[in-house]
Every structure is written in structure tokens, then in C-alpha cells.
Amino acid sequence: MDVDELISSSKLLKHWPSLFITLALIWIVKRLFFKGNRVLKTYNLDEQVEEEVEHFADLGDELQPALEDKPHVPFVPGQNLNPNGAKRLYELMRGRRSIRSFNSHPKPDLSVIEDCIRAAGTAPSGAHTEPWTYCVVQEPELKRSIREIVEQEELVNYSQRMHPQWVTDLRPLQTNHVKEYLTEAPYLILIFKQTYGLSENGKRMRRHYYNEISTSIAAGILLCALQAAGLASLVTTPLNCGPALRNLLGRPVNEKLLILLPVGYPKDGCTVPDLARKNLSNIMVTF
């Protein structure tokens, strides 16, 4: 069979010019459609940026820094600096554990808690906004109300909201929706992040940049201070409880609950999971 006979006997080869034209048209349409979408997305993005620029441009000379514009002063390092201080801090912090069983008595003096929060207040923050509020609760009735709110939400969290794998991962820690430590611990420290500032008359003021990161850094310093004071704590982040707890404490709308810390001395015979922390080689990369 010669080439002409092969072409005439094959429907595909016989109509190849039409097929070629059809495929070429499909390719051209796809290219135009893709290019049109790409241009449309770029245009929308540019348009959005232009709107934002115009919005800020309207402020003109009204823009003022949130901080008072003062001359810088010489840096004064902290006191009692020690070259071995980092190692001493590590030895201190390696003993820190999450404690879920607290003694109601003896109760640490409130001044100790105040000093720990003072230390937390030295944390850096975006544009020096210091976007944090520490609510220290020691009244038994108020602690019971907090526990009631948290346990109601946690029951729903464990039974409905949380993924089964999450609940399974928590099993070795022996945690559930019952939070006895909320009434056992002599102190509860509720750490709120401030998403923006408020004036004395409740008017919204400056934006608080990186408020969650800033408040989280401060919370880490607080944990170090509590450990240095010989106090035990537990970092908790109650799901879906923030608004109710904020209202209970009468906090303003610009504050959102970030962390709830039970604080006190561990109960006699208190046990913790047999866990090991990662080695330095697993958490540090040197270049």
C-alpha cells in the first residue's frame, strides 16, 4: 500500500487539515483566555494598591507618629551581667514543665506576680505599642466562673470541634475538658493582646503592629520570670472562650484573649509526662 492509499483509507489522516486548524484555534483561544485572566488579575491588584495609596494620601499632614518624637539617649546595659548567665538561665529553664495540679496553699505573695509581669513588660513590641494586658485573677468566685466558661466550651471542643487526630495526640498528656487547675491554682493570669489602642473616651486610636507576636514574646519572658520565682505554670489557649472571658472581666473590645496561665506551687506528688526536649543539633542551624 502506497502513501496515497494509506491517507485515503485513514479517516484521521484524510481530515488532518481540518483537525490541525481546529487544534490551532483551540490553542489560540486558550492563550487569549489565559492572558486575559492574567491581565485582569494584575489590573485588579494594581487598582487595589492605588485605592490604598489614595486612602493614605488623603491623610496628608495629619499623619503623626504614635510615639513622642524625642532625641535618642545613650544605651545603658542591664545590671549584674554575667558571661555565664545564658548557661545559668538554661539550667533554670530546663526544669520548667507544664503543671496541671496545683496547691491552693501556700499562696505566693502578689508582689511576686507583679515582679514577674514587670519583667514581661520589658519585651519588645512593634513600634513600641506594648499591646498587652495582664489580668490577674485570685478571687475564688471569679475563678469558678472562668472554669465554668472554659469547661463548657472545652466539652464541645473535645467532642465536636477538634479533629479526632488532635484528641488522640493529647491522650498521652492525659488532658480532657475538665480543668480542675482553674480553681486549684491560686492565680490565673489572662494575657490579652490589644489589636489597636483606645483613648480614654473609648475612641479607636493607633494600630498595634504585630500585636500577637509582641504579646507572645512577652508571655515567654513571663514564663521565665515565673520559673525564676519558683512558681509553676501551664500555658493554655482555651478555644472559643475569648469573648466570654473578656466580657466576664469587663475588658474593652480591642483586647483578645491569647493565653490563660494558671500559676502557683505544684501539688505534692504531682506527676508530669516523661518527655525529652530536642537536642541543640535538632533546633539550631549554623551558617
From Swiss-Prot:
- Where can this protein be found? Cell membrane
Tell me, which GO biological process terms does this entry list? positive regulation of fertilization; tyrosine metabolic process
Q: What is the effect of changing residue 158 to F?
A: Moderate decrease in catalytic efficiency and reduced affinity for substrates I-Tyr and I2-Tyr
Task: Mention one GO molecular function.
Answer: oxidoreductase activity
Give the membrane topology, semicolon-separated if more than one. Answer: Single-pass membrane protein
Q: Which residues bind 3-iodo-L-tyrosine?
A: 127, 154, 158, 179
Q: Where does FMN bind?
A: 96-100, 125-126, 235-237, 277
Q: Does the keyword Zinc apply?
A: no
Q: What does the tissue specificity note say?
A: Expressed in spermatocytes.
The cross-references to Gene3D superfamilies, in alphabetical order and at most eight, read:
NADH Oxidase
Query: What's its catalytic activity?
Result: 2 iodide + L-tyrosine + 2 NADP(+) = 3,5-diiodo-L-tyrosine + 2 NADPH + H(+); iodide + L-tyrosine + NADP(+) = 3-iodo-L-tyrosine + NADPH; 3-iodo-L-tyrosine + iodide + NADP(+) = 3,5-diiodo-L-tyrosine + NADPH + H(+); L-tyrosine + chloride + NADP(+) = 3-chloro-L-tyrosine + NADPH
Metal-binding in keyword set: no
Null mutant phenotype: Adults produce fewer progeny. Larvae display an increase in survival when fed a diet enriched with 3-chloro-L-tyrosine (Cl-Tyr), whereas survival is unaffected when fed a diet containing 3-iodo-L-tyrosine (I-Tyr) or 3-bromo-L-tyrosine (Br-Tyr). Adult survival is unaffected when fed a diet supplemented with halotyrosines.
Q: Which domain of life is it from?
A: Eukaryota
Question: Which chain regions cross the lipid bilayer?
Answer: 15-34
Q: Give the required cofactors.
A: FMN
* Keyword field: Cell membrane, Flavoprotein, FMN, Membrane, NADP, Oxidoreductase, Transmembrane, Transmembrane helix
Give binding positions for 3,5-diiodo-L-tyrosine.
Answer: 127, 154, 158, 179
Q: Which GO terms describe its cellular component?
A: plasma membrane
Query: What else does UniProt say about it?
Result: Named condet in honor of Dr. Jean Francois Condet who discovered that ingestion of iodide could reduce goiter.
Tell me how this protein assembles: Homodimer.
Described function: Catalyzes the dehalogenation of halotyrosines such as 3-bromo-L-tyrosine, 3-chloro-L-tyrosine, 3-iodo-L-tyrosine and 3,5-diiodo-L-tyrosine. Activity towards 3-fluoro-L-tyrosine is weak. Important for male and female fertility. May be involved in maintaining the viability of sperm, both during development in the testes and storage in the female spermatheca.
The protein, known as: Iodotyrosine deiodinase
Q: Which organism is it from?
A: Drosophila melanogaster (Fruit fly)
Lineage, highest ranks first: Eukaryota, Metazoa, Ecdysozoa, Arthropoda, Hexapoda
Q: Which gene encodes it?
A: Iyd
